[in-house]
Every structure is written in C-alpha cells, then in structure tokens.
Regions:
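Intrinsically disordered, low-complexity terminal tails
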Residues: 1-44, 339-340
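A contiguous, surface-oriented mixed alpha/beta subdomain in the mid-to-C-terminal portion of proteins
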Residues: 169, 176-182, 196-252
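Short, aliphatic-rich beta-strand segments
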Residues: 125-129, 219-223, 313-323
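Alpha-helical scaffold segments that mediate packing/assembly in large oligomeric complexes
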Residues: 125-210
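Internal, hydrophobic cores of structured domains that mediate oligomerization or house catalytic pockets
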Residues: 104-126, 130-132, 140, 146-153, ...
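Assembly/oligomerization interface modules of large self-assembling protein complexes
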Residues: 40-123
C-alpha cells in the first residue's frame, strides 16, 4: 500500500465520534462477500479502509480521557524549534508617591525573572497489519489494533503531563505552616522548595493548612480510591455558624482529578505509568506555570509492509511536543498527606 496521509480520515473520524455515531465495516466485508484484501485493492475501498482504521484509533483515544487538560496551557505552533527558551517575567514593581509641582511620575519596573529551556521530543509508535488478517478477513482484529493504538497515545500523554507532579520532590520545610509558605514561594533570585503538607488532626484541617501554603491552588490530583473521603470532607467543612469554610469555598467535586496510572504490555515487556498513591493528593495552581508546547499532535501515516514477515502494511504515528513545568513556586504545586 502506498504511503497515505491521514488528514482527511482524521477529520471524518473525529466528526463521527463527536456526533456520537459509529463507523463499521461494510456489510459486504462483514459477510465475506468482499475480503479486506479486495476492499483495499480499489481506490474507494482503500480510502474507506483508511477511514475505518483511523476511526478505530480515535475511538481508542476517546476511551482514555486526557485528565491533564485542566492543568496545562496548550501552545500549538508548527514553527516551534526543537529547543526554545521561555522567560518568566519577575514581579511588577510599582509605588505611588506624592506628586509635587515640577516633579516627575515614578514609573514601575519589571523585577528580574527566570529563563528556562524547553526541549521538544518526538514520540512514536507503530502497528502492523498482517497478511493473515486479510486472508482470514479478521476485521475485528484490525479494529482492535486501531483502538489499542489510540489508547496507547492518550496513556502516554497523561503520563508525560502528570509525572512532573507525581514524580516531583517535596519537603516539609520549617516549623510551621507560615514557614512552609515562605519556602514554597521562594524568590525570583532563589527558587522555592515544593512543600509536603503533613496530616493534621483531620482532613478538613489538613486541607486548610494546604491552602494557607498555596492560596491560589484550585485543583486536586488524586487517586480514585480517595475521592469519596475527600468529597465528604469538603462537603462537611463548615464553620460553627454553618457557613462554608475556606476548603468548601475553594473546592468542589469537579476540582478533583483522578489518575491511578496505567500499564502497557508490548511484546512481553510491561511499561508502567505511575499514578497518584492513595493517601496523598496534589494541590495545583493550574495553567500559569504548566505549559505544553505542541509542534504537531498525533500524525499517522501508512507505508509498505515487509513481505518476508508477511506484513501487509505498517501504520506509524508520531507527535512532537515538550513541557514547561514549575512546582516550587507560589503558582506551582504541593503534596498533601491525607492519611491519618
């Protein structure tokens, strides 16, 4: 099969999924009157085969939600270089002074910032459709291949974007919450230290301590096993006069993001994507300090196979992207021990 760019097929597949419709093999193919080999031997049949394969791929992606999207700002630009620098502006420094006759207005200034380097990486995977699949008209097997391909891509994206939080280094600095807040924020000349908040008396108190250290935090990255205890703690967090506490005003059930991790087994080798450990959660300030740079998303092409291995065609997908993250700052993230 000649190399085919899947752009048109991608548009069709995503449109069908968005409209909650399905795309199945034709009745002729399912009944055996026409084999898949015969189908792809014609121009129209080849196009339908590509559309069906691409649909299965995107159906697989739909089955693995991208849970990180609430946390990151996305920058899509085909002109992104492999390596780029991002300059974070320092604080805006402004002071109001009394204006005397003939005097000048004092203009504000930008404080010193931090320059960071972002490297974009290429992530790729391939699947192969064998001659046996076509000879025996195994349409269900080809659909499984496409779905697994899409699932694997979304699993990778969740892993890449959530690892900076889950795999970050956190410490309990200082003797009290006030000291931890100072350590978390640091300065532009001297970076902060991402904080670990210890369990204190009960869950609402612990969460309240966390908000004192990271006041701008609005999202909790959690293990699914902890959802109900967290929801109960948030719902019951009230002051003596029954008015909602800081915790209840700051959080709702929709602010809890579950990630238990994932595993992918390929050729007998297991790849593990570590999730949030039950008993810990991460309070995060979304967007500002967490950016994903996307040169291009999942690009999928097919090419000639390998006759010596009876591979009819190979389908390769790849994406080029990078991340900029900063957890140790006032707009970053902290880790919270919620287990008594």
């Amino acid at each position: 099969m000649n190399k085919v760019i899947f752009e048109h097929a991608v548009k069709n597949a995503t449109s069908i999924i968005k409209e909650q419709k399905s795309l199945d093999w034709s009745d002729d193919v399912k009944s055996g009157r026409v084999t898949v080999r015969e189908m792809i031997g014609t121009d129209d049949g080849s196009r339908e085969f590509i559309e069906k394969t691409t649909y299965d791929l995107y159906q697989g992606r739909e089955s693995v939600p991208l849970v990180y999207k609430q946390l990151y700002t996305t920058i899509n630009d085909r002109n992104l270089p492999k390596t780029l620098t991002e300059e974070e502006f320092g604080p805006v420094q402004v002071v109001f002074l009394e204006k005397f006759e003939g005097g000048e207005v004092r203009f504000g200034a930008l404080g010193p910032g931090v320059t960071k380097t972002v490297t974009l990486h290429t992530y790729a995977a391939g699947i192969e459709l064998t001659e046996d699949m076509l000879e025996w008209n195994q349409t269900w097997r080809m659909s499984e291949v496409g779905v697994a391909f899409g699932e694997a891509y979304n699993k990778l994206l969740n892993h890449l974007h959530l690892t900076p939080f889950i795999g970050g280094t956190y410490a309990t600095t200082g003797a009290n919450i006030a000291a931890q807040k100072v350590a978390q924020e640091g300065t532009y000349e001297d970076g902060g230290i991402a904080q670990l908040i210890a369990f204190d008396t009960d869950l609402p108190t612990t969460l309240r301590n966390a908000f004192q250290v990271l006041p701008r935090g609005t999202k909790l990255l959690i293990n699914s096993a902890d959802r109900y205890v967290l929801e109960d703690a948030i719902a019951s967090s009230m002051y003596a006069d029954t008015s909602p506490s800081l915790v209840k005003r700051k959080l709702s059930a929709s602010d809890l993001i579950e990630y238990d991790g994932d595993t992918v087994t390929v050729g007998g080798k297991e790849y593990t994507y570590t999730g949030v450990t039950s008993g810990y959660v991460y309070l995060i300030v979304p967007k500002r300090k967490f950016k994903e740079y996307v040169k291009h998303g999942l690009r999928t092409d097919s090419g000639d196979g390998d006759l010596s291995r009876l591979i009819l065609t190979q389908i390769v997908g790849r994406s080029r992207r990078g991340l900029l993250t900063s957890i140790a700052c006032k707009q970053g993230a902290i880790k919270i021990d919620i287990a008594a």
